[in-house]
From Swiss-Prot:
Cystine residue pairs: none
Catalytic activity: L-ribulose 5-phosphate = D-xylulose 5-phosphate
Cofactor section: Zn(2+)
GO MF annotations, alphabetized: aldehyde-lyase activity; L-ribulose-phosphate 4-epimerase activity; zinc ion binding
EC number: 5.1.3.4
GO cellular component, one term: cytosol
Regulation: induction: Transcription is repressed by glucose and by the binding of AraR to the operon promoter. L-arabinose acts as an inducer by inhibiting the binding of AraR to the DNA, thus allowing expression of the gene.
Family label: Belongs to the aldolase class II family. AraD/FucA subfamily.
Protein name: L-ribulose-5-phosphate 4-epimerase
Organism: Bacillus subtilis (strain 168)
PANTHER family on file: FUCULOSE PHOSPHATE ALDOLASE, L-RIBULOSE-5-PHOSPHATE 4-EPIMERASE SGBE
GO biological process: L-arabinose catabolic process to xylulose 5-phosphate; pentose catabolic process
Amino acids binding substrate: G27, N28, S44, G45, S73, S74
Record Pfam families: Aldolase_II
Amino acid sequence: MLETLKKEVLAANLKLQEHQLVTFTWGNVSGIDREKERIVIKPSGVEYSDLTADDLVVLNLDGEVVEGSLKPSSDTPTHVYLYKAFPNIGGIVHTHSQWATSWAQSGRDIPPLGTTHADYFDSAIPCTREMYDEEIIHDYELNTGKVIAETFQHHNYEQVPGVLVNNHGPFCWGTDALNAIHNAVVLETVAEMAYHSIMLNKDVTPINTVLHEKHFYRKHGANAYYGQS
């Protein structure tokens, strides 16, 4: 069942270590088959070096396990909520990558300071508000998804494929699991670039709007011309 999706999600999870986005087991990737209404996600606490396609857990859109003998990621309710809230995404990544998490712990958006950021995100990468005690105590992971969706009332999730959860870390998404990994790598890279830019020039300002839009829309949208497609 869902063998192709399992292979993709396995490959994406293994890329977390390849791209140095995780320490120990501090991250997870999922993918969704919209037609079959099934989600495939990493099991909780399993080392990446031990992970196989057979270890991955298959869920329905209520977050219930329909295949697999292991417990799904503890972040499963967040993934499930985001798949419902963002109907055009096909994969989700959560990590505690150091640079993006530093911004999340500071409670700050990552400002768009250059064209690397502009190539992938059409605005600042937002940081969510702090969660209320009641949201943390009851249904914490579900409420994490809700606070992300709340943040994207003011952003286009397809044009800003990532977010910083306040005091926690980044979530990224994409057209599929591997594309979500790509966006997570970019987010980590621009998080580091932004930090160093601010350290070098405390008065640095966001990229010129015209330049930002030029770089974003030459790669995205109906008139994109970057690449070979």
